[in-house]
């Protein structure tokens, strides 16, 4: 071992060891495991001689038990981690695209205790060899020779097995200055010893793992098997003369009857229960010569205190009632002396155990002897006691170090967590001596196509659809939801008569206004609960269908608050929501009567908070209807206003879905055909109204297609801004879309590179190329890179003008003063819309504000720039 007597010599040794460790860090797992095996075998072969040296040098402990500890440190630790990977790639998750690569921390400085010198050295050397770290050990001055012998034994075995020379060494002549320099110079400090030494390790300025003193309280419950408990405690507390820091320090017996049984059992198992006079004698000895008692046998301690005990006495039991720093029996005693307390109740016993840990040894170890069936009492103890090792019906000395009588990992360094001022809350393992590098490969977000289980379309399909759905779902009670206008004008009568012919009992709910509110949904839920249907049928435009979706979801998930449901999300799979996972109980069929939002096919809904007047855009997969019916016969009598507004809303959703970051080949078809249908047929339907049934069918299809595209891609800026504009200034949603769409299209093309989206996990798609493909699909010709976009933009503007939508907000009579007063709040709500994030070009809040101003003033608006 290194003859280091000066700081300079220590510094030179550390430099040598770092070079050796760099070589060691290149070793393969096979080479490392071979060295570990050799070290463990050498330690086992020399376990007896090392134990003899430890007892002789320290004058502490019991030879046979030290032999066992040496054997344990080598055999149990080697076996536990024999197949544990510590080199190269140690873990791979192909699904997540994650690799974990192990790297050694470098040079470890180990501070060793006088209580377990050789076994602690073997344990820490094995862990460092397993993790390809170099280790420089600093022994306790009273155990330096036996520690150096243990280190030399392990080092020679490691070198013979191929380890680089110099990766294991020991300071043969320890001194405080050298130990402090060591702690300040290594990459990681492993400190085992007294509280002062552990605190010094944490104050060194280097990463440290400390294993400090304990003060293990053990509760004996009335339901415990007293004989088994006492036999276990005696064997644990007398092991190596009580030198293990995890050994029992105080027994708390619950109830006077239990205390008497405990005393009798201790006497049977070679314990001596001290009377009050003997307790005073021993208390005085602890006050004056506690250090001399460490690791001594019970008979020696009794004789030193002037107490007569039988020769076979293994353990001294001192009765006490006080828990304080002035009571020596309430503190840690590294010798076969145990304190006995009486608690009147289990709750008092818990209080006493907490006080003992707070006094000394918080975070270390605690024990409980109890009937395993007393689950409530065990749970209460588990929750209240602040200890990292909670042992039930187990000897704490052997149980805490692991693998002997518990499933804990084998260790001779026991972390106490933050309760004990340690960064380690558990037993020291190889993983704590590794720097694990995580390699994360880029992943594409898994996408799914969400649409109703069945979509019925073509004119006159309603009857056939409902009959087919009845055969599948066998429904007998229908909650029929529509708006007041449709019910009053008897638009729903044909469907209700059909339900009557099918023999279905139904109730009609139509207490809805054009702007759906939270209060209306809550009233509808009350009606749902009263009728308890087999099926919900929603018929109408966006308001009625959104109401049906929200009522069903809130009826089946009453635990979900509106605040949670409307909360914004970045990823719909990771949203923060308190909903319990359960299967939907009630099918929902939607029948569209307008060609606009495509609500019949989407898991989206808009509801207004009547208190603030702000609309909430809600998205949830469980809002998706079970089946959708798109029957153009229900749309024959749409007036011009609903026709143009629905058409422009459809065009906006389809176009933005095609450009969305979440667009895929699956959704492109929906979006492209929807755009083409609107551009080709909206004007015909608008001009000829009921006369052009073919155009009506195309618009009905376009609306549903746009809805399915939007449900899976999330439309972007225009939809977000239109929702806010409609809410603040009471413009129809389609009108808002018609005003905003051309302006936002131009903005996006101009700022594609400047305003990048945050969702980098989606493949880049050139906005200009997408517009070119869209223009070509809609028959707007080919040309230069910008020409197709210009043609598409011109087509949208011309369509807007021909269906008589004004190009500015101001043209609709919105007062300038009111618009400017509400602009900032409206801008914030629009930008905060959940769909804004999925736009290919996400405008900032200031840009959204400017876009609103351009759309209010039109071409006359000029941006005010600072001089």
Can you annotate each of these PLM segments?
Residues 1-99, 127, 268:
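N-terminal Rossmann-like NAD(P)+-binding subdomain of aldehyde/semialdehyde dehydrogenases
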Residues 4-6, 122, 198-324, 351:
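ALDH superfamily catalytic-core signature
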Residues 25, 307-446:
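Conserved C-terminal structural/oligomerization subdomain of aldehyde/semialdehyde dehydrogenase
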Residues 85, 150-151, 519-633:
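Glycine/threonine-rich beta-strand-loop-alpha-helix active-site module
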Residues 89-228:
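Rossmann-like NAD(P) dinucleotide-binding subdomain of oxidoreductase/dehydrogenase enzymes
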Residues 447-535, 809-810:
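ATP/NTP phosphate-donor binding region
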Residues 601-713:
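Carboxylate- and glycine-rich phosphate/diphosphate-binding segment that chelates Mg2+/Mn2+
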Residues 728, 735-821, 861-862:
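Gly/Pro-rich interdomain helix-loop hinge
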């Amino acid at each position: 071992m290194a003859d280091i007597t000066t700081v300079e010599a220590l510094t030179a040794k550390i430099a040598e060891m770092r070079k050796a460790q760099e070589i060691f860090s290149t070793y393969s797992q096979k080479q490392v495991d071979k060295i570990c095996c050799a070290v463990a075998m050498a330690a086992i072969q020399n376990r007896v001689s090392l134990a003899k040296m430890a007892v002789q040098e320290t004058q502490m402990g019991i030879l046979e038990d030290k032999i066992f500890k040496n054997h344990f440190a080598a055999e149990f630790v080697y076996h536990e981690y024999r197949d544990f990977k510590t080199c190269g790639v140690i873990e791979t998750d192909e699904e997540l695209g994650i690799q974990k690569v192990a790297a050694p921390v470098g040079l470890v400085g180990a501070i060793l205790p006088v209580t377990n010198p050789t076994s602690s050295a073997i344990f820490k050397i094995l862990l460092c060899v397993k993790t390809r770290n170099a280790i420089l050990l600093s022994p306790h001055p009273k155990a330096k020779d036996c520690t150096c012998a243990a280190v030399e034994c392990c080092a020679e075995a490691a070198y013979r097995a191929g380890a680089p020379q110099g990766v294991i060494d020991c300071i043969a002549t320890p001194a405080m200055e050298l130990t402090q320099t060591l702690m300040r110079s290594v990459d990681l400090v492993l400190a085992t010893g007294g509280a002062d030494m552990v605190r010094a390790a944490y104050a060194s300025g280097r990463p440290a793992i400390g294993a400090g003193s304990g003060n293990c309280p053990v509760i004996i419950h009335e339901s415990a098997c007293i004989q088994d408990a006492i036999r276990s405690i005696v064997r644990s507390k007398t092991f190596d003369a009580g030198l293990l820091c995890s050994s029992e320090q105080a027994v708390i017996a619950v109830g006077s009857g239990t205390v008497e049984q405990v005393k009798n059992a201790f006497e049977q198992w070679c314990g001596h229960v001290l009377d009050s006079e003997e307790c005073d004698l021993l208390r005085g000895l602890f006050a004056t010569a506690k250090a001399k008692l460490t690791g001594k046998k019970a008979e020696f301690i009794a004789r030193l205190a002037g107490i007569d005990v039988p020769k076979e006495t293994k353990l001294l039991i001192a009765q006490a009632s006080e828990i304080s720093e002035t009571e020596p029996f309430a503190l840690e005693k590294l010798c076969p002396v145990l304190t006995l307390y009486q608690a009147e109740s289990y709750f008092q016993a818990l209080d006493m155990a907490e006080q003992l840990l707070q006094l000394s040894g918080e975070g270390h170890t605690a024990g409980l002897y109890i009937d395993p069936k007393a689950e409530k009492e065990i749970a209460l103890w588990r929750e209240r006691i602040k200890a990292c090792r909670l042992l039930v019906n187990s000897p704490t000395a052997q149980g805490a170090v692991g693998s002997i009588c518990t499933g804990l990992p084998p260790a001779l360094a026991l972390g106490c967590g933050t309760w004990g001022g340690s960064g380690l809350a558990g037993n020291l393992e190889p993983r704590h001596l590794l720097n694990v590098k995580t390699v994360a490969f880029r992943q594409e977000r898994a996408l799914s196509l969400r649409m109703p289980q069945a979509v019925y379309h073509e004119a006159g399909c309603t009857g056939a659809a409902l009959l087919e759905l009845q055969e599948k779902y066998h429904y007998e009670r229908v909650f029929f939801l529509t708006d007041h206008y449709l019910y009053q004008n008897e638009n729903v009568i044909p469907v209700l008569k059909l339900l009557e012919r099918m023999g279905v009992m139904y109730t009609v709910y139509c207490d809805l206004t054009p702007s759906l509110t939270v209060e209306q949904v809550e009233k509808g839920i009350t009606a749902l609960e009263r009728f308890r249907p087999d099926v919900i049928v929603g018929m109408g435009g966006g308001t009625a269908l959104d109401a049906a979706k929200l009522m069903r979801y809130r009826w089946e998930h009453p635990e979900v608050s509106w605040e949670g449901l409307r909360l914004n999300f970045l990823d719909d799979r990771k949203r923060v929501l308190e909903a319990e996972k359960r299967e939907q109980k009630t099918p929902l069929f939607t029948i569209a009567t307008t060609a606009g939002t495509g609500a019949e096919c989407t898991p989206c809904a808009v509801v207004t908070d009547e208190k603030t007047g702000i609309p909430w855009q809600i998205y949830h997969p469980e809002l998706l209807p079970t089946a959708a019916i798109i029957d153009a016969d229900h749309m024959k009598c749409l007036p011009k206003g609903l026709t143009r507004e629905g058409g422009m809303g459809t065009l906006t959703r389809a176009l933005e879905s095609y450009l969305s970051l979440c667009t895929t080949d699956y959704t492109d078809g929906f979006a492209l055909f929807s755009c083409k249908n609107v551009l080709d047929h909206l004007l015909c339907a608008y001009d000829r109204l009921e006369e052009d049934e073919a155009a009506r069918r195309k618009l009905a299809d376009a609306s549903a297609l746009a809805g399915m595209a939007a449900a899976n891609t999330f439309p972007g800026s225009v939809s977000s801004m239109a929702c806010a504009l409609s809410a603040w200034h009471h413009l129809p949603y389609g009108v808002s879309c018609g005003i905003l769409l051309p302006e936002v299209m131009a903005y996006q093309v101009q700022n594609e590179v400047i305003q990048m989206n945050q969702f980098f996990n989606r493949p880049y798609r050139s906005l200009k190329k997408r517009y070119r493909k869209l223009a070509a699909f809609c028959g707007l010709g080919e040309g230069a890179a910008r020409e197709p976009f210009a043609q598409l933009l011109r087509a949208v503007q011309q369509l807007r003008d021909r269906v008589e939508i004004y190009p500015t907000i101001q043209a609709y009579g919105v007062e300038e003063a009111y618009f400017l007063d509400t602009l900032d709040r409206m801008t914030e709500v629009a930008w905060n819309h959940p769909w804004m994030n999925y736009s290919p070009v996400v405008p900032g809040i200031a840009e959204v504000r400017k876009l609103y101003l351009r759309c209010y003033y039109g071409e006359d608006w000029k941006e005010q720039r600072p001089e």
